[in-house]
């Protein structure tokens, strides 16, 4: 009272229970920090549990009330829930015990309710929350992953060894998957019944079957991925940062139709839930991203040092007149005429991407149309890739059970789409990979891998066209041996790639995503230790690269070196994409899985087109040049079946047609084939820039098998006699794959 009379402020007693915390601390943390003090002053040992409101009470004839659970889950402490989900992007690399008390962060909800409370139906709560969330919500995948964990805990599969008293088996289905049996088809026959049952069993840890690869001392270093792994990781981090922090205005969205091969067989919502092609194709590509993708392609290094035109309606610069081929005479190896290289650029552009680019630009082709062809062609190829089996070829792996394949079940080769746009996209030597807007529709890592593989194949084809033409079709002895060796390796790589596309497509669309039949695409260890996860391809590389004749060809031939870099680029990019798919398949990230699947398909189309060009040049050296060329036994038979299986992606060109097309393009460009060296003033040479990404990095490994995987060397002229359709287009069987 004396202070009040004197005009000074009066100090009040601290009876309000006010507490001091950091001003940025969350409200829930401030309340929990002050609760013990308030409870102690009020004489209570614990806070009183708030009773639920009357209209959320459990009905007397029901065990639980879904409305109460949904209300408590969604509305309870909603101010903090969004922050928890957003922080998941920044705390993914923290310790295993970080956030152990939060069921949403650990994917392991409590098995029983808190003491004194009613049991919670967490599965229903998660499903209701997923229904109200939009597709673009950043934490939707987190909710789906947690719901799958809850489902697996509440409905465990039955142990077949426990007898009939074991609980009934209920297959784990994807939250957004097809209904059981959506693929249709008949049941497997009695001969395959046991194997099919083993393939359909649930396999939650697919890496256990490949644990021996980690202990194998012969694979201590794994496949040499060189600088691609770091570049892919950096590209993935940049894409995450762009999606989180870059303001992107809403783009106009269009309706994405079903692939034509699936029309009338499945609902669009069910299909796009399993393969999110709508998310990749619905939004038009951003102009800035397209410009960055074009700049990244143009700034990439090339072994010849020249700028490559990829997607343009203007021919590259070149000199008209005589086209002089052949290696320059001199002491230095790996030389080529600069004039012939620039002429080969124009020739390659006209034979490949030039016609496609001008047709697309003239018809104003929309991005949705190319996506429609691409997804339909990939699904058609997946349905026929398993039929790569025939006379003279190595036995193909066993087919997947029909219940596991689902919508991709087929009994014969699926014919390609015959529409005008599909015919256009299937031509041009499989050059869709050079379309910048198409690569932009993929995510960061698949776009990088597609660019890396496409650039390597493009540089190799330049040297292939610059060294020989119709007047001088024969290559040197070292070049012929190297080209035949790469022909065998590329065929083996393409076989593995098409096999993976078949498995990955069935895994995405099938009703049993965790079945043991999909172990090859879900396991991560094989792609960390083997090229494309294949021990057969590993042994084929060892047999080819360690040959003394092959090493001699590498020492003197620029063509052998540049094709080695192309092979390493394709195998590295494809292996990285397969590993990306396995990583995202573990948490069922459908968008990233679909992007990796499309990236492998894009590389496979370009690989089949480049393989067709390589075969025609090698066969032309024997048929028109009169040179002896040897290939591995069974290579042409395997390629013939691969060409039939990949027919929905790319149309192969036989030898006579290729020779006529090349001569016609040279006449249009006013190029005159000359078999002699160039005259004075035109004798400028170019030397191949050696790179670390060369096939020499594959030297010095040990084979995994005790028996050779490649057949003996045979004359390609005798092998072509058994496959006349590769030369003249005649002699095909009554149906695809029937030779």
Curated annotation (Swiss-Prot):
<protein>
    <recommendedName>
        <fullName>Tegument protein UL47</fullName>
    </recommendedName>
</protein>
<feature type="region of interest" description="Disordered">
    <location>
        <begin position="154"/>
        <end position="198"/>
    </location>
</feature>
<keyword id="KW-0804">Transcription</keyword>
<keyword id="KW-0805">Transcription regulation</keyword>
<keyword id="KW-1048">Host nucleus</keyword>
<dbReference type="InterPro" id="IPR005029">
    <property type="entry name" value="Herpes_UL47"/>
</dbReference>
<feature type="short sequence motif" description="Nuclear export signal">
    <location>
        <begin position="94"/>
        <end position="121"/>
    </location>
</feature>
<dbReference type="GO" id="GO:0030430">
    <property type="term" value="C:host cell cytoplasm"/>
</dbReference>
<keyword id="KW-0946">Virion</keyword>
<feature type="compositionally biased region" description="Basic and acidic residues">
    <location>
        <begin position="1"/>
        <end position="13"/>
    </location>
</feature>
<keyword id="KW-0945">Host-virus interaction</keyword>
<comment type="similarity">
    <text>Belongs to the alphaherpesvirinae HHV-1 UL47 family.</text>
</comment>
<dbReference type="GO" id="GO:0006355">
    <property type="term" value="P:regulation of DNA-templated transcription"/>
</dbReference>
<comment type="subunit">
    <text>Interacts with US3 kinase. Interacts with UL31 and UL34; these interactions seem important for efficient virion nuclear egress. Interacts with UL41/VHS. Interacts with host DDB1.</text>
</comment>
<feature type="compositionally biased region" description="Basic residues">
    <location>
        <begin position="28"/>
        <end position="53"/>
    </location>
</feature>
<keyword id="KW-0426">Late protein</keyword>
<keyword id="KW-0920">Virion tegument</keyword>
<keyword id="KW-0832">Ubl conjugation</keyword>
<dbReference type="GO" id="GO:0042025">
    <property type="term" value="C:host cell nucleus"/>
</dbReference>
<dbReference type="Pfam" id="PF03362">
    <property type="entry name" value="Herpes_UL47"/>
</dbReference>
<feature type="short sequence motif" description="Nuclear export signal">
    <location>
        <begin position="483"/>
        <end position="493"/>
    </location>
</feature>
<dbReference type="GO" id="GO:0019033">
    <property type="term" value="C:viral tegument"/>
</dbReference>
<feature type="short sequence motif" description="Nuclear localization signal">
    <location>
        <begin position="10"/>
        <end position="30"/>
    </location>
</feature>
<comment type="function">
    <text>Tegument protein that can bind to various RNA transcripts. Plays a role in the attenuation of selective viral and cellular mRNA degradation by modulating the activity of host shutoff RNase UL41/VHS. Also plays a role in the primary envelopment of virions in the perinuclear space, probably by interacting with two nuclear egress proteins UL31 and UL34.</text>
</comment>
<feature type="region of interest" description="Disordered">
    <location>
        <begin position="1"/>
        <end position="123"/>
    </location>
</feature>
<keyword id="KW-1035">Host cytoplasm</keyword>
<feature type="compositionally biased region" description="Acidic residues">
    <location>
        <begin position="62"/>
        <end position="87"/>
    </location>
</feature>
């Amino acid at each position: 009272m004396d202070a009040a009379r004197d005009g000074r402020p009066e100090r009040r007693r601290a009876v309000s229970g006010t507490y001091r915390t950091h001003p940025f601390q969350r409200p829930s943390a401030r309340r929990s920090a002050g609760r013990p003090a308030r409870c102690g002053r009020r004489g209570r040992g614990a806070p009183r549990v708030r009773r639920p409101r009357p209209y959320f009470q459990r009905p007397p004839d029901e065990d639980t009330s879904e409305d109460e659970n949904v209300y408590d889950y969604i509305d309870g402490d909603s101010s903090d829930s969004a922050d928890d989900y957003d922080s998941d992007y920044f705390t993914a690399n923290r310790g295993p015990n970080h956030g152990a008390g939060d069921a949403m962060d650990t994917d392991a909800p409590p098995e029983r309710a808190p003491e004194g409370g009613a049991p919670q139906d967490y599965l229903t709560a998660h499903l209701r929350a997923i229904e109200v969330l939009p597709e673009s919500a950043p934490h939707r995948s987190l909710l789906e992953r947690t719901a799958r964990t809850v489902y697996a805990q509440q409905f465990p599969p039955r142990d077949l060894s426990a007898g009939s008293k074991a609980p009934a088996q209920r297959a784990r289905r994807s939250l957004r998957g097809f209904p059981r049996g959506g693929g249709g088809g008949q049941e497997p026959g009695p001969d395959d019944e046991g194997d099919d049952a083993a393939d359909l069993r649930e396999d939650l840890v697919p890496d256990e079957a490949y644990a021996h690869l980690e202990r194998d001392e012969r694979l201590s270093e794994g496949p040499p991925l060189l600088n691609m792994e770091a570049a892919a990781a950096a590209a993935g981090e940049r894409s995450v940062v762009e999606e989180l922090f870059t303001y992107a205005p809403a783009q106009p969205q269009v309706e994405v139709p079903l692939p034509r091969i699936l029309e009338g067989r499945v609902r669009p919502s069910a299909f796009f839930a399993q393969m999110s092609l709508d998310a990749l194709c619905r939004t038009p590509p951003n102009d800035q991203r397209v410009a960055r993708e074009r700049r990244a392609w143009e700034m990439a290094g090339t072994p010849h040092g020249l700028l490559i035109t990829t997607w343009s309606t203007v021919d590259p610069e070149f000199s008209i007149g005589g086209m002089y081929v052949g290696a320059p005479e001199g002491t230095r190896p790996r030389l080529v005429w600069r004039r012939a290289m620039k002429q080969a650029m124009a020739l390659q552009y006209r034979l490949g991407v030039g016609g496609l680019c001008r047709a697309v630009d003239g018809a104003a082709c929309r991005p949705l149309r190319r996506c429609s062809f691409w997804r339909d062609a990939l699904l058609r190829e997946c349905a026929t890739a398993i039929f790569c089996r025939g006379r003279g070829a190595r036995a193909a792996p066993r087919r997947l059970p029909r219940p596991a394949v689902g919508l991709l079940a087929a009994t014969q080769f699926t014919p390609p789409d015959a529409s005008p746009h599909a015919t256009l996209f299937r031509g041009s030597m499989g050059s869709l990979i050079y379309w910048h807007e198409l690569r932009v529709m993929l995510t960061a890592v698949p776009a990088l891998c597609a660019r890396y593989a496409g650039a390597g194949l493009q540089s190799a084809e330049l040297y292939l066209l610059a060294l020989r033409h119709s007047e001088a079709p024969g290559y040197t002895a070292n070049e012929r041996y190297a080209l035949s060796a790469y022909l065998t390796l590329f065929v083996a790589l393409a076989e593995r790639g098409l096999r993976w596309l078949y498995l990955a497509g069935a895994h995405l669309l099938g009703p049993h995503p965790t079945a043991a039949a999909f172990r090859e695409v879900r396991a991560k260890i094989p792609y960390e230790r083997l090229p494309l996860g294949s021990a057969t391809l590993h042994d084929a590389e060892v047999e080819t690269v360690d040959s003394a004749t092959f090493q001699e060809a590498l020492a003197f031939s620029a063509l052998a070196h540049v094709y080695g870099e192309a092979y390493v680029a394709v195998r590295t990019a494809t292996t990285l994409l397969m590993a990306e798919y396995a990583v995202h398949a573990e948490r069922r990230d459908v968008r990233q899985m679909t992007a990796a699947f499309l990236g492998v398909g894009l590389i496979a189309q370009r690989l089949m087109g480049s393989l067709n060009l390589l075969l025609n040049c090698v066969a032309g050296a024997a048929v028109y040049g009169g040179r002896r060329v040897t290939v591995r036994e069974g290579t042409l038979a395997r390629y013939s079946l691969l060409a039939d299986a990949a027919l929905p992606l790319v149309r192969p060109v036989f030898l006579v047609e290729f020779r006529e097309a090349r001569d016609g393009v040279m006449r249009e460009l006013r190029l005159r084939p000359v078999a002699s060296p160039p005259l004075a003033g035109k004798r400028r040479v170019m030397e191949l820039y050696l790179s670390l990404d060369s096939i020499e990095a594959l030297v010095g490994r040990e084979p995994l098998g005790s028996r050779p995987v490649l057949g003996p060397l045979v004359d390609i002229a005798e092998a072509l006699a058994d496959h006349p359709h590769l030369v003249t287009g005649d002699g095909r069987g009554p149906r695809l794959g029937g030779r």
